Structures are given as C-alpha cells and as structure tokens.
Regions:
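Conserved C-terminal helix/tail region of periplasmic/extracytoplasmic solute-binding proteins
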Residues: 312-346
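Secondary-structure end/capping motifs
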Residues: 240-322
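Bacterial N-terminal signal peptides
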Residues: 9-21
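Short, solvent-exposed loop/beta-turn-alpha elements that line the ligand-binding surface or hinge
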Residues: 63, 116-120, 221-223, 297-304
C-alpha cells in the first residue's frame, strides 16, 4: 500500500471548512445573545410556575443571554394590566374570563405556551368531598343541591367542576357556590360549612391528611381532554420587537419544565428541584412537596385547545365573559417551535 503525503492545500481546505462550520447559523443560534437582553417576568409563586423558577435558578436564562428579573404578583388579576402596560414582558397567567376578554378586545398579548395541566399522573387539581359524605355522594348526580367552595366562578378549576355537573345532568343554578381561598376551604370542610370544594395541591394533601375530606374525583378522572390550568403570555411589543429574545426565553423555560418533569417522574435531582420550589412558592415544607400530586406540563409546551374552549363556554354561560375570543388569532407557537428545534421533541 502506498501512502501519499498530506499537502498544504489539503490542510488549508480542511481548516477553512472547520471555520465555516463553526460560524454556521446552527452554531450561532446557541451562543448567548450579545448584547444581553433584560426581561421582566411576572409570576404569582404557584407550583405551576416551576419551569420559570427552575430556569432562573439553574441559569438557563443566563445561558441564553437574558437577564431576567422576577416580578411577584399577589393575585392573577394584577398580571394582565402589567403585560398590557409593559411593566412585564412575559408572565404566567391563570385561565380566566379577563384573559379571554383581553384577547377578544385585541389587547396586545400573545398566548405562547402551557404553564400547568391536569393529566393522568399529574392530578394536582381535584373535587374533594367532606369525609362524612362519602356514602351520600357516589355519582355525579349526587352533586345536585350541594354547597361547593370555589376560588371563583371565573377560574379553570370551577369550569372543570362545571363539566362534572354536566355529567350528572345538573345546571350550575342547582348547586351553591361559595368563594373562598384555598386555606379557608380546608377549614370550612373541617367545620362542615361546605359539602365539597375544588382544591389544588398542596391543599388536597393537607385536607385528606387531616381527614376532613376525601379526594372524590381528580379532574383528570372525568375530563374528556387534558385540563389547561395555566398559560404563558408574551406582550405583543416584546414578541415583535425582541423576537430573538422571545425565542431564547422559551428555550430556557422549556428546559426548566423538562427538569421539573424529570424530577417528578424519574427522580432526577428531585431534592434540588424541591428546594427551588420551596424557596419560590407558598409550599415551604419540602417533605410536603414530596407527597403532593405533581403539576402536569406538556413536554413540548403545547396548549390543550379543547380545554381552553370549554372554559370559554363555561364563562360565557355564566355571563362572566363579554365575547368569544378567537384563539387561533392569539396563539403563536413560533417560539416553542424554535425551542423544540433546539432541545428536541419529547
């Protein structure tokens, strides 16, 4: 066999090809943004904000060239005005009539990703019944005439209770709704002031541990679709004027939700993830975080449109929403598509 010496021209061609590859668009995509972009991000401190808090603490936003400042809101109604006025560029939000009304009125916002779903294995929302009523309430029809505590008629968990009432052939007017905060619901179950409640974790676990209620039905047990309980919204100005930053934000956020899902399904860094949640959410007891049903997330960030439309139907039926919002005009998946192209589809 004859070996030929490698010529200088061959080496030069190889070197130039390597340089061209290093400067390719794919390589440039993953370099941090320069200059860095500052983003104000709204959150209320719910466990469903897990992807946000994990991305912040693990440096995923920083890796993308983003300087993210968390802005804390005490209640969901504060979020939409903050997005509309530009106080924050990105925020999580509950699914409410106010959200749909804002979309219907054309307020500058985009619906861009999932932020919390009720699905099989992720039953963080449930209908609970007082412990002493378990023999009396066995079927959906047995909900007629009962007094239920809800966070409000205009929230997704109450719309999901509405689906349970439908299964029992019950109109909303045939039950009594009492609006209470989640901690107050547990107390009301204990003193028998209510018959049942729509609870979220960790209050489901707390109520059952105190034996004041039983988990009657998880929302995932009867909904004909995955329940969409939270969403991510971008201000339209941010999305249009800082499009590259909007894409990079989504990469970091989706990495955060993946880290959460890996922790709760496979135990990957479970203690570390729980420690992050304990620092940022109302659930400060790490041992409680280990026991509660986890929040669900679509691993590719997609929204459950059927759930959002069902919520709209409920809000319109109760006169809580002014007009139907055309979701096809406000949902924008280009940022998720970019993130999935970077991280891979799950």
């Amino acid at each position: 066999m004859t070996f030929r010496p490698i010529t200088t021209s061959f080496v030069m061609c190889f070197f130039l090809a390597a340089l061209a590859n290093a400067a390719s668009p794919a390589a440039a995509q993953t370099a941090p943004l320069n200059p860095r972009v500052a983003i104000k991000l709204g959150a209320i401190g719910a466990v469903s904000d897990a992807g946000i808090f994990i991305a912040q603490e693990k440096g995923y936003f920083t890796d993308e060239g983003l300087d993210v400042e968390l802005v804390s809101f005490k209640a969901a109604p504060q979020i939409l005005p903050a997005i509309a006025t530009g106080e924050v560029q990105v925020s999580g939000s509950a699914v409410t009539p106010a959200l749909f009304n804002a979309f219907a009125r054309g307020i500058g916002m985009k619906l861009v990703a999932d932020k919390g779903q009720v699905a099989k294995g992720f039953g963080f929302a449930a209908i609970v019944i007082r412990s002493d009523l378990t023999d009396a309430v066995k079927d959906f029809k047995d909900l007629r005439g009962r007094k239920f505590a809800v966070m409000g008629k205009g929230v997704s968990s109450t719309a999901q209770l509405g689906k349970a009432l439908e299964l029992g052939g019950i109109e909303p007017s045939e039950v009594e709704f009492v609006e209470l905060g989640l901690p107050e619901m547990v107390a009301a179950l204990g003193n028998k002031a209510i018959d049942g409640a729509t609870l979220l974790e960790p209050f489901i676990t707390l109520a059952t541990a105190r034996n004041v209620a039983v988990r009657w039905k998880g929302m995932e047990d009867f909904l004909p679709f995955t329940g969409q309980n939270g969403v991510i919204i971008y201000s339209q100005k941010f999305a249009e004027e800082q499009g590259e930053a909007a894409k990079r934000w989504m990469v970091a956020y989706l990495k955060g939700t993946h880290a959460y899902l890996d922790a709760v399904t496979s135990g990957v860094d479970r203690d570390g993830i729980n420690a992050i949640l304990a620092r940022h959410t109302a659930v400060k007891d790490v041992s409680l975080l280990r026991r509660i049903a986890p929040t669900g997330f679509d691993p590719n960030g997609r929204l459950e449109i059927k759930s959002l439309e069902a919520d709209q139907d409920w809000f319109l039926k109760l006169g809580l929403q002014q007009g139907h919002a055309d979701l096809s005009r406000v949902i924008d998946y280009q940022y998720l598509d970019y993130a999935v192209s970077r991280l891979g589809k799950r």
